[in-house]
Regions:
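Short, surface-exposed loop/turn motifs with a glycine/proline- and acidic-biased composition
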Residues: 328-354
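Residue-level detector of functionally pivotal "anchor" positions at catalytic/ligand-binding pockets or at interdomain
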Residues: 275-294, 307
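Sec-dependent N-terminal signal peptides
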Residues: 4-13
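C-terminal tail/sorting-segment detector
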Residues: 3, 346-365
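Short coil/turn motif common to extracellular beta-sandwich-like domains
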Residues: 296-304
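N-terminal module-boundary/linker segments of secreted carbohydrate-active enzymes
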Residues: 18-79
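Domain-level detector of nuclease and nuclease-like folds
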Residues: 95-104, 111-279
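Short, glycine-anchored, charge-dense loop/turn motifs used at functional sites
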Residues: 316-324, 347
Length: 365
């Protein structure tokens, strides 16, 4: 547990400068008491419109460093706006039967689980409604997120997969959508947010759909079935809060007037669901807690990876999921690995050691 908390506390420090003074002053408890305190803080917010509200928000909440739409399902290159207005890729009801043609609005927490468009304000809550590839969104449908351990029936442009879930204690033959590693923490924190912001409603959603029933446990405090909560906590630790999420949190706050506490304070997840956190294998997080990447963003085409771990493999992956550079058995000096002559852009660094891996987001200016 010490190493998990170290990771989460380090991640939390990224966003402190952006959190309004005193915003979490009433969040003083632990366990479900803390969750209810957070519920009371974030439940009241401005419900924005489905259209044009969400479309307009995405210009500031989901913009990549290159100015394109940030799509977590495919990382396809999408231009903001409609084709008629800007030559963009926003969905207008045409195209999208193939990947990388159109982006639309994805309820990462499926809307059918809470009753569809009648579920207000959940239906337009930007913290979980994100821009994604229209084709991939349609294929995911109402599937829960999960781990596809065997053969996948479909793989997206950035490596997300659809197939039978192999996470521990999963319902038999459950078909799930597994996001790319670099976005697993993002969706996990969406689910913690939904469990908290809608604490007064979520217990009643369990039996609305079969897929929702596989994930929800019918309570307002624990909220999720153990298999799903354990998976979300694992992803929360393996893919720490990034600058992308911090920027998105601030952009949504500017419009909705509330925040995602688990982006501002990642440590809250284990303070609330402490029993589930304690059940996790802390060895799997040792690599994550012991890595420092700097400078990030980098202005000199160079990044340093400082860690006490002996890395087996370093992969530099672009936003389309392509491996741009791979170093097997890299050498370190004073526990520091250095990558040089990196081209400008946004990348993912996948670091592996002793069958463990972690993906970090980096920007080269």
């Amino acid at each position: 547990m010490k190493k998990i908390y170290l990771l989460l506390l380090l991640s939390a420090s990224l966003g402190f400068a952006q959190i309004p003074t005193g915003y979490y002053s009433t969040a003083t408890g632990t366990g479900y008491t803390l969750k209810t305190q957070l519920f009371n803080k974030i439940k009241a917010h401005t419900a924005i419109s489905y259209s044009p509200g969400l479309w307009n928000l995405y210009y500031t909440s989901d913009v990549r460093p290159d100015g394109k739409v940030w799509d977590i399902y495919s990382d396809c290159i999408f231009v903001f706006g409609t084709f008629a207005a800007t030559g963009g890729n926003q969905d207008t009801g045409t195209l999208g039967s193939n990947e990388c043609e159109r982006y639309n609005r994805e309820h990462t927490f499926p809307k059918s689980w809470f009753g569809g468009p009648s579920g207000v304000p959940m239906y337009t809550d930007a913290f979980h409604v994100m821009p994604t590839d229209k084709h991939d969104n349609s294929l995911r449908g109402n599937m829960p997120y999960g781990i596809v351990g065997g053969t996948s029936s479909y793989t997206t442009n950035n490596g997300a997969k659809i197939g039978i879930c192999t996470a521990a204690n999963t319902p038999a033959s459950l078909i799930v959508f597994e996001p790319a590693d670099q976005y697993k923490g993002d969706v996990a924190r969406n689910y913690f947010y939904m469990a908290t912001c809608y604490e007064d409603k979520i217990a009643s959603w369990q039996k609305i759909t079969t897929d929702g029933d596989a994930v929800l446990d019918g309570t307002s405090d624990h909220v999720y079935e153990n298999w799903y909560l354990n998976l979300m906590l694992k992803w929360h630790a393996q893919d720490p809060v990034s600058q992308k999420e911090i920027d998105r949190n601030n952009a949504v706050y500017a419009v909705q007037g509330n925040r995602n506490p688990y982006i501002d304070h990642p440590e809250y997840a284990c303070k609330i669901w402490s029993v589930a956190c304690a059940a996790l294998n802390t060895n799997s997080f040792e690599l994550i807690a012991d890595i420092n990447i700097y400078p990030n963003p980098s202005n000199n085409q160079r990044v340093n990876i400082e860690t006490e771990n002996e890395l087996d493999d370093i992969q530099l992956i672009n936003i389309n999921g392509q491996i741009m550079q791979e170093i097997k058995k890299p050498s370190a000096q004073n526990h520091t690995y250095t990558l040089e002559n990196l081209p400008k852009g946004f990348y993912f660094l996948k670091l592996s050691a002793d069958s463990r891996s972690i993906t970090k987001k980096i920007i080269i200016n």
